[in-house]
Amino acid sequence: MTITPQHLIALLPLLIVGLTVVVVMLSIAWRRNHFLNATLSVIGLNAALVSLWFVGQAGAMDVTPLMRVDGFAMLYTGLVLLASLATCTFAYPWLEGYNDNQEEFYLLVLIASLGGILLANANHLATLFLGIELISLPLFGLIGYAFRQKRSLEASIKYTILSAAASSFLLFGMALVYAQSGNLSFEALGKSLGDGMLHEPLLLAGFGLMIVGPGFKLSLVPFHLWTPDVYQGAPAPVSTFLATASKIAIFGVVMRLFLYAPVGDSEAVRVVLGIIAFASIIFGNLMALSQTNIKRLLGYSSISHLGYLLVALIALQSGEMSMEAVGVYLAGYLFSSLGAFGVVSLMSSPFRGPDADSLYSYRGLFWHRPVLAAVMTVMMLSLAGIPMTLGFIGKFYVLAVGVQASLWWLVAAVVVGSAIGLYYYLRVAVSLYLHAPQQPGRDAPTNWQYSAGGIVVLISALLVLVLGVWPQPLISLVQLATPLM
């Protein structure tokens, strides 16, 4: 296949981030300079984000048999790049107090974001596997970056071992699918399934095993056991990336697979996914009730949020509204998570041992950091799905597609799960306004709102509120990505 200039334009985000990886690597080899390498990383990610405009002008196309660039890919590439940018921004002040090598952090984030972009453009099971591995391998190092802390190292080892096992299941499942269908391309798989192969035992077994890989990365029950420990043990900026970019990219590629290859047409697959969604929603919310560590709480709540998204995925065959629901929900989840983890990062900067992740550390925050407390309140309300926030719009969409597809038991699970979630999110919000403890703990810098991380947190809060009241710009953007499939 001949690569034309149009193909190169379509691959601009991937090429720019790849070039940035090389430049940062050479910069580290030449001279260690934290500010220089952080700046190069942010410039590269911003350039990749701007290049999406040129990609849009080029139109949808199959760049290679492995990759398709279209509106869908652009939307998810943009979300991954935004999450990566926020991670680098939150990491800079955190790393200022870090005594070991600082620069490699940005290199690992860039490589992981490269994997996320690859997943957003994936059109083949080989690309899916490569993308998942490319996003996972740097996370092994990022999670254990504060390696002098026992819980960070423990979290990294847990994630590494379990991730390797999940990847093995994914690869074995792909082998079974290939053995039955003779194809790994999403479109070719769609044709094979359309020819009546969907009920072949080998194919069903293959897809069943393949669920384990993405299910692990998305923290879905019963593949969720790593989530609370890793969220708690990982540095706050890494938890930001883990909760946003990683999950958005992987959910995006799973949805594209379901669009091309109508796996959801199989009643057996739908029942299995329905049980996973139901269990994730209920279990995630119930376990979050008793948490006193904010990062663990957000870890358990992420299990339930991915359960909500799975409802929209199951309803995908019922209409295009499911794609719209997933896009809007993921955007709301991205900005809400960036804000919540951003506050934790600001409270934990610079690196001074364990993060400020205990709920007690935030007690009475309003009385000395009122704006930061207001931002955290907005994020908790959005994650809870309270009206006038972007989280409510996303949750409303999920309920609407659930009703449209007559998934009544899952709709009931979403309603019950949201009611349970309201309690623990409000518990965090209320603690911000209680009387401050006699001995103050960790605190954000006095001028936090003027730092790059503070600006990202404030913009996230503003977007959550503005798009919660006036969601039409976001809905229009997501709708633009839908017809190009």
UniProtKB/Swiss-Prot annotation:
One of its GO terms (cellular component) is plasma membrane. The keyword Acetylation does not apply. It catalyses: a quinone + NADH + 5 H(+)(in) = a quinol + NAD(+) + 4 H(+)(out). One of its GO terms (molecular function) is quinone binding. It comes from the Bacteria. The chain crosses the membrane at residues 8-28, 35-55, 71-91, 105-125, 127-147, 159-179, 203-223, 235-255, 271-291, 297-317, 326-346, 373-393, 408-430, 455-475. Keywords: Cell inner membrane, Cell membrane, Membrane, NAD, Quinone, Translocase, Transmembrane, Transmembrane helix, Transport, Ubiquinone. It is found in: Cell inner membrane. Its main location: membrane. Its EC number is 7.1.1.-. It is a multi-pass membrane protein. GO terms for biological process: ATP synthesis coupled electron transport. Pfam families: Proton_antipo_M. NDH-1 shuttles electrons from NADH, via FMN and iron-sulfur (Fe-S) centers, to quinones in the respiratory chain. The immediate electron acceptor for the enzyme in this species is believed to be ubiquinone. Couples the redox reaction to proton translocation (for every two electrons transferred, four hydrogen ions are translocated across the cytoplasmic membrane), and thus conserves the redox energy in a proton gradient. Belongs to the complex I subunit 2 family. NDH-1 is composed of 13 different subunits. Subunits NuoA, H, J, K, L, M, N constitute the membrane sector of the complex. This is NADH-quinone oxidoreductase subunit N.
